[in-house]
């Protein structure tokens, strides 16, 4: 049950979705029909696509850039020709660009996103960076990937899986399209585990982020949804259990900045 803390709607751990799932019925704190959720999420990202980096800066106080660097460092992309990665919900290219550059421009990355506006931003950025030859852009649903079994050496998703209505389906699809020996990595906002930081981050999230979002983009509602969706997402241990249930082995996670974000890893063995 949500607790009132001044004007801050603070969500306790009991309000988070557990390992059994349930994100398909929530749009932030609002209960919705699961058939509505994807359309509502799409509307949010159509609105914020051109300001996506600003959005992530607001959500993470600029730390998302450090976390993404750490994600790709832990992935350790191969520098051998032919190594392939699928970056899901990766429209603007932040993770894919890092993978290509760390691999010495040997990796080929498929960027998949359900939102065409996000992909458009990513394609423009890729051309400006001179990375377009290493990339493919695909508009499709994470729950129904348009690829053959055992297609990719790695699967990454950053700040995207909490927006997928059926997380279990997305995880099953990730497992299916990875080659044996392939690696799954997911970076997502998570449960802050330091009590003082928890309170500070709640104040920042619920008071400041929507207001700043409105000043910069004229849209407070999208930022409110994004904050609320973080508080509904499963905590670290529960999400790890979901990854294991999808078939992955050697599942582990690392907290960043006291648990503001967590990086989960699993292997298809």
Curated annotation (Swiss-Prot):
Enzyme Commission no: 2.1.1.163, 2.1.1.201
Listed InterPro entries: SAM-dependent_MTases_sf, UbiE/COQ5_MeTrFase, UbiE/COQ5_MeTrFase_CS
Swiss-Prot/TrEMBL catalytic activity: a 2-demethylmenaquinol + S-adenosyl-L-methionine = a menaquinol + S-adenosyl-L-homocysteine + H(+); a 2-methoxy-6-(all-trans-polyprenyl)benzene-1,4-diol + S-adenosyl-L-methionine = a 5-methoxy-2-methyl-3-(all-trans-polyprenyl)benzene-1,4-diol + S-adenosyl-L-homocysteine + H(+)
Keywords: Menaquinone biosynthesis, Methyltransferase, S-adenosyl-L-methionine, Transferase, Ubiquinone biosynthesis
Any one GO biological process: menaquinone biosynthetic process
Disulfide bonds: none
Recorded metabolic or biological pathway in which this protein acts: Quinol/quinone metabolism; menaquinone biosynthesis; menaquinol from 1,4-dihydroxy-2-naphthoate: step 2/2; Cofactor biosynthesis; ubiquinone biosynthesis
Pfam families: Ubie_methyltran
GO function terms (MF aspect): 2-methoxy-6-polyprenyl-1,4-benzoquinol methyltransferase activity; demethylmenaquinone methyltransferase activity
Domain of life: Bacteria
Annotated positions binding S-adenosyl-L-methionine: 92, 113, 141-142
PANTHER family linked to this entry: 2-METHOXY-6-POLYPRENYL-1,4-BENZOQUINOL METHYLASE, MITOCHONDRIAL, METHYLTRANSFERASE
Family per similarity comment: Belongs to the class I-like SAM-binding methyltransferase superfamily. MenG/UbiE family.
Function: Methyltransferase required for the conversion of demethylmenaquinol (DMKH2) to menaquinol (MKH2) and the conversion of 2-polyprenyl-6-methoxy-1,4-benzoquinol (DDMQH2) to 2-polyprenyl-3-methyl-6-methoxy-1,4-benzoquinol (DMQH2).
Protein name: Ubiquinone/menaquinone biosynthesis C-methyltransferase UbiE
Annotated source species: Brucella canis (strain ATCC 23365 / NCTC 10854 / RM-666)
């Amino acid at each position: 049950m949500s607790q009132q803390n001044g004007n801050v709607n603070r969500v306790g751990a009991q309000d988070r979705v557990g390992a059994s799932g349930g994100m398909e019925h929530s749009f932030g704190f609002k209960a919705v029909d699961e058939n509505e959720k994807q359309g509502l999420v799409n509307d949010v990202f159509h609105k914020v696509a051109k300001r996506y980096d600003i959005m992530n800066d607001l959500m993470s106080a600029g730390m998302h850039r450090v976390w993404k660097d750490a994600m790709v460092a832990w992935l350790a992309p191969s520098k051998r020709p032919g190594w392939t990665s699928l970056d899901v919900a990766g429209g603007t290219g932040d993770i894919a660009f890092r993978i290509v550059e760390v691999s010495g421009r040997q990796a080929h990355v498929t960027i998949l996103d359900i939102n065409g506006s996000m992909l458009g931003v990513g394609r423009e950025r890729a051309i400006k960076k001179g990375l377009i030859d290493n990339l493919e852009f695909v508009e499709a649903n994470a729950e129904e990937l348009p690829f053959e079994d055992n297609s990719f050496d790695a699967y990454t998703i950053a700040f995207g899986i909490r927006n997928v209505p059926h997380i279990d389906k997305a995880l099953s699809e990730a497992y299916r399209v990875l080659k044996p020996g392939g690696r799954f990595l997911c970076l997502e906002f998570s449960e802050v585990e330091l009590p003082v930081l928890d309170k500070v981050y709640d104040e920042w999230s619920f008071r400041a982020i929507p207001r700043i979002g409105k000043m910069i983009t004229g849209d407070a509602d999208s930022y409110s949804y994004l904050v609320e969706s973080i508080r509904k997402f499963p905590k670290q241990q529960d999400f790890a259990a979901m990854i294991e249930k999808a078939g992955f082995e050697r599942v582990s996670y690392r907290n960043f900045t006291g648990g503001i974000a967590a990086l989960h890893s699993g292997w298809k063995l």
